[in-house]
Amino acid sequence: MENVALPLFYQGMNRRKRNALALEYLDRLGLKDWAHHMPNEMSGGQKQRVAIARALITQPQIILADEPTGALDSKTSVEVMQILKDLHKDGMTIVVVTHESGVANQTDKIIRIKDGIIGSIEENLNHNASIFGVNGGAMK
């Protein structure tokens, strides 16, 4: 919980209020029961959700998600991408940086950058596809 509440500490919020908000955000991400666990007791997906809660707690206008599924198993990757999609549906701007085409293909727009130069910008009409292909099956 302290990890999620940390940005509010730097904003000068009192401990009681920041802990209450941290617990609320952990609950939204399905981690309320894990609020007092240490990071070494959590899975990669749980840690990623903690990071998302920490990013959201200050109610930013934009989230920069750098390789949000990089160290996750396939099931947890789908869950994390669904969280990001839900946030986007709620009006938040999400910028996903990834090397994985399956992750990029879930976004509304794909901007390809090579050597620091924008190569192409594409509207992604298939952005509702699963991370593992249009039909949701595992890629072969």
Kindly label every feature range from the protein language model.
Residues 9, 16-33:
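Conserved ABC ATPase "signature" region
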Residues 74-76:
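Helix N-cap at the start of a conserved alpha-helix in ABC-type nucleotide-binding domains
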Residues 78-90:
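Helical segment within the ABC ATPase nucleotide-binding domain
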Residues 37-40, 58, 90:
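Conserved signature/switch motifs of ABC ATPase nucleotide-binding domains
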Residues 38-48:
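Conserved ABC ATPase signature
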Residues 63-66:
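Catalytic Walker B motif of ABC-type/P-loop ATPase nucleotide-binding domains
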Residues 1-6:
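Short coil-to-helix segment of the ABC ATPase nucleotide-binding domain corresponding to the Q-loop/switch region
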